[in-house]
């Protein structure tokens, strides 16, 4: 790492900022489609806070979305369920381009190198996701009203229990819970029905993934490792799957997968580890630190009183 080119290192962090901005603009597009008047730069800051929540809670987005929804509702002036629908929509749309990019990389390498066991596993994972994600999306959408009813049945006793345990909070009624769950699904329907907004959000999501791949590629280049760009297109999306591990932000799991795949693709062990450290410092540590400060402001009583 000490031998890394400082100019290229600066470019890594600049690209990381571009990634965060692109996905923040994706959030802005979704919120605008839901009737929020939030400004683009504010949405980027809010997304940084949401990224902090994802990075410090287990299971990545699944653990951070409820907290991120609170930040969104406070800053965008929306109901909590609308904020939850917005961040859930953004995270779902963000996931789609990763499958396509990883598929492009896998196809490229199938014509260039023979697959070892690790590359075969990566290709199987990408293929499984390419099939499973569209199928689950179609099934979930076709049966969304049943899913909504099931969500109400599950949420009602849980919310009632929390309401009894938390001091100075009365348990919500079943009608209030049903209204909020319906509001969440109604917001999801509004997002899915806005084709122009979906296309724009998808474009920002794709740009963000390209920035992430570029960050890893530049991290390798800073260490004197010149690799084909499709290497990053394969490694970054597959590594993101490790973000679902029960560790904050997938910490440890993501790094292990990234290093393993880079080594399988011919990068020396030491260079792979150093490049991943640089890449994750720019795309994990930096947004966690910056997003944590923003989250502190959004969560403060002063902000709540002024909003």
Give the role of each language-model region:
Residues 1-48, 117-238, 290-307:
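Predominantly cytoplasmic-facing regulatory/coupling regions of multi-pass membrane proteins
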Residues 1-2, 53-163, 251-307:
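Transmembrane helix-loop-helix hairpins in multi-pass inner-membrane proteins
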Residues 15, 51-59, 220-222, 236-256:
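Transmembrane alpha-helix interface/packing and boundary motifs in multi-pass membrane proteins
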Residues 6, 36, 77-78, 225, ...:
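Helix N-cap/coil-helix junction residues
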